[in-house]
Amino acid sequence: MIKQIKGMAVCLLLHSAAATAFSAQAGDLGTDAAVIERVISAGGSISEWLVAVGAEQQLVGVDTTSLHPQSLQALPSVGYQRQLAAEGVLTLQPQVLFGSDEMGPPPVLQQLRSAGVQIETLPVDANMLAVSQAVRRIGAVLARSEQAEQALSAFKQGIWQQQQKLALIDGAAPRVLLVFSVGHGNPLTAGTNTVGDWLIKQAGGENLAVHAGFKALSSESMLALNPQVIIVVDRHNQGLAALESILSHASALQYSDAVKNKRIVALDPTLLVGGLGPRLPEHIAQLMDAFYPQFPSVANKN
């Protein structure tokens, strides 16, 4: 476990250096930052980073996944990030639209570009390099580079603190499955290169889903993996209701160790949209508590 933590720390340093080089190049691009006053964000974590760098007053609209902080819910909605409507966006007269490669559809983005909207497609891969590049790009575009560095520093410090706590735990990594209810058919499971996979590993768990991205697995396939802990994610239900929704489409999971031992953890779905967000360190601590209940004080130790 200690070797794993040291490796993570080295990755943090390498990603920071590479992202700094990216930021230097990115700062020379785009609209004159001094005059940007109207911004739209599509992607929950992206919106949270805009708030973290002090740009909330520049936001004139957000997508439906942008629910944190709660104050964003008072802003006009431009719909779901994958299904933006040009008219709805242009009505808000934005100068810049921040999003990821999940943002679309492409014809709408082209229409927005033609109308003079600066489209900023940020990297949202689930790693420290991508989040560093994204936050620094936000800072460069909005003339908030100093605030971006401060927000990144706080985020990395939070991750480092959780890594130090994890290094104190002497125990086998629990077998974990993150299951995302889609309301119909087999639920999705979070595999590699997802925020869910990153969270599981940062909290000291073993992700049983080895496929790339999100993939639907049959009820029997998930039972064969026999997770010790199940993280449930549901846009419409919370807690036991979320588990019941998942079991209604994957009934075999009721025989898994996780369900039999009541080791079910609910996760806010907005954490999984738009890359790594600023709230993740606190959720790593919560998952660590759930993964290692025999060490109840470790995740919260100052």
Question: Residue spans of the language-model regions?
Answer:
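His/Asp/Glu-enriched short active-site or ligand-binding loop at hydrolase and phosphoryl-transfer sites
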Residues: D63, A190-K215, D234, A266
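Basic- and aromatic-lined ligand-binding clefts that recognize polyanionic substrates
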Residues: R38-L50, Q147-A203, L272
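Short helices/loops that flank or line small-molecule/ion binding pockets
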Residues: A86-Q93, S218-V229
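Extracytoplasmic ligand-binding site segments that recognize negatively charged/polar headgroups
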Residues: P107, P123-R137, G171-V195, G239-A241
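A short, structured surface patch at a secondary-structure boundary
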Residues: R38-L92, V96-M103, L208, Q238
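Structured C-terminal subdomain patch of bacterial secreted/periplasmic proteins
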Residues: E37-R38, A130-A140, E149, R235-N302
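Bacterial N-terminal signal peptides
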Residues: M8-T20
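A ligand-binding cleft/hinge motif common to bilobed small-molecule-binding domains
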Residues: M103-S114, V232-S248
